[in-house]
Amino acid sequence: MFGEHFVVYGIKSILCSINKRVTVTAEKTKERKISINSEIGKLVLEPNESISKIDSPLKPFYYLANKAIKDQNEGLEIEIESEIPLGAGLGSSSACCVAGAAAIFKLFGKISKEKILELAIEAEKTIYQNTSGADCTVSTYGGLMEYDKNNGFKKIEDEPNFQLVIANSNIEHSTESMVSKVKEFENKNKEKFNELSNLESKLVEDVLKLIKENKIKEIGEKINQNQKFL
């Protein structure tokens, strides 16, 4: 909701989960192969391939599967279904990493949410090296939370009574490309970026107070302000 892009640079953000889900099904197979199938394609590889040589958006799943079966004499078959539109800025990649980590590693015993999050962030780094971990965190724990890269998350218990409407333009954008553009701006305009970061940081603190006071109209106005900073 607040602090996107700035969160990569250690600024606090406010995150909110939505009612769209990713479903990942994982099954053990006798054949020692990793097979991944989704609406965006298919990937079938032997275990222990070099991650850096895999040119596929499905490689986070391969990373997780390969890690899970490294001491096992078996393979994995993974099926992915997503309700989240791709390239719409709704964290579909992170949600996939979280669902993938949970589905795959639960085949081999109990796993905590903390461990699922750790594995999901590792997997996401195969496609977004400088991930903040924000989207993986809210996908793991759900609800409304404040988050920063250095201190982790804190659930916001005073959830305001309002509904968010998300409009999808159906114009896909690359997260990697947008993150690179922000980094380029930060490198060339240090002073301006620091000024914007300070403004965003204050905005987030103001919004946290408004949430506690359940001031919906004012929160909406802050959303517009957040968009201007972006």
Region spans (language model):
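A generic structural signal for short beta-strands and their flanking turns/coil linkers
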Residues: 20-22, 74
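Short, conserved micro-motifs enriched in small and acidic residues
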Residues: 55, 90-98, 131, 194
